[in-house]
Amino acid sequence: MSTIQETSENLLRFCGDQKYATIYADPPWRFQNRTGKVAPEHKRLNRYETMELEDIMALPVAQVAAEKSHLYLWVPNALLPDGLAVMKAWGFEYKGNIIWEKVRKDGEPDGRGVGFYFRNVTEILLFGVRGGGNRTLPPARSQVNLLRAQKREHSRKPDEFIPLIERCSPCLLYTSPSP
């Protein structure tokens, strides 16, 4: 059985017949250079299995999303177009984003990030909706789209995002194929 098939079946089994009004996803993006090779630093570290863009797009997220629902989708800066494509494939329309500014304990930017053109100290949480007239909850309308938080273990997103999302959108489902 393929990884994508197993992952899809696990998601559907976990959700059962439940449809979720809010989905928070952090797919295991695969980074490749122009020749299609996996970036050496990612290949060397091999922390967890990653997925091809087409496999992420094929995940059955639309099947577990309510008719009117919100999607919060993490995407690395370099893969922004891919993140937008995934959002569309899952049946969501892009509406905005929240930027995570990665900081050190002293509050200064954490310049340890990687980047071919710039040293990345941010990551993007895309926000999309499914279904007409589907606004965020009232607290979201005063929420700025920047959150400064410390970087933790590799790929771990700040815990501070969960209560933010819970204030802004109903009934959260967290899906993360990566560990």
Where are these regions (language model features)?
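Conserved Class I SAM-dependent methyltransferase catalytic core
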Residues: 54-106
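Conserved small/polar residues in nucleotide/adenosyl-binding loops
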Residues: 174-179
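Replication-associated primase and helicase/ATPase modules
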Residues: 1-2
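Flexible, glycine-/basic-rich loop-and-beta segments that form/coincide
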Residues: 113-172
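SAM-dependent methyltransferase catalytic-core segment centered on the flexible catalytic loop
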Residues: 8-73
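Short catalytic/ligand-binding loop motif for oxyanion handling, primarily in non-cytosolic enzymes
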Residues: 31-34, 80-83, 135-137
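Short, flexible loop/turn elements at secondary-structure junctions
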Residues: 24, 29, 77-79, 101, ...
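Short alpha-helix plus adjacent loop in nuclease-associated cores
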Residues: 103-117
